[in-house]
Swiss-Prot record:
Quaternary structure annotation from Swiss-Prot or TrEMBL: Part of the 50S ribosomal subunit.
A GO molecular-function annotation: structural constituent of ribosome
UniProtKB keywords: Chloroplast, Plastid, Ribonucleoprotein, Ribosomal protein
Protein name as annotated: Large ribosomal subunit protein uL2cz/uL2cy
GO cellular component, one term: chloroplast
Amino acid sequence: MAKHLYKTPIPSTRKGTVDRQVKSNPRNKLIHGRHRCGKGRNARGIITARHRGGGHKRLYRKIDFRRNQKDISGRIVTIEYDPNRNAYICLIHYGDGEKRYILHPRGAIIGDTIVSGTKVPISMGNALTDMPLGTAIHNIEITRGRGGQLARAAGAVAKLIAKEGKLATLRLPSGEVRLVSQNCLATVGQVGNVGVNQKSLGRAGSKCWLGKRPVVRGVVMNPVDHPHGGGEGKAPIGRKKPTTPWGYPALGRRTRKRKKYSDSFILRRRK
């Protein structure tokens, strides 16, 4: 990511960075309005996901996660910013006149050609099922035809490490090793915008535009609001171990549902 550092005497933008190479110019037929329900609230209006709310209005870009334009080559026309995800997106013009958005593969530039199918070259941006061991992939399907569901965030990449029978073994970005069907599609390469974690927003207002509310420590709250709250001055939490706002252990507690149907496909849990 080509970062531009603001050079200004104003404290709010003194250390902010912005990517000048990527702009937003969405196509009307590939976007639609989307109501952001609740923003962290449930149907009763109670907060279920903390630190969410506000944010700028967004138009949803229809992303082609299925890559079902088989054996039809397409050309990358633009690389655009998407407010709904960290990764950038590409506008593809296919040979039959179809236009679609896909996730931007790292290193892809305007003018590159991509294609999806069963017997296509193993090159960056192509979507296929059969590929050699050690291939870096992203946008991986779990169920054939449902579309990519794994490794879709900015900079995400998985690795194909084994094949046996009808199943393939993948190492995911989280460190998890799991099995998927060899009939599932995946896209070759890594998702672009790798340096998203090095981006500096520069001020609190920029984070509010993203729909993220301030995070307050529990130790500075009142006892009625958090188990860590209360005391005189800078008092400790008063417990042996940190807890969540609802009193459960905060560090190391497993939150995955027991006896989940996909447990048999996970060979090693995430780190």
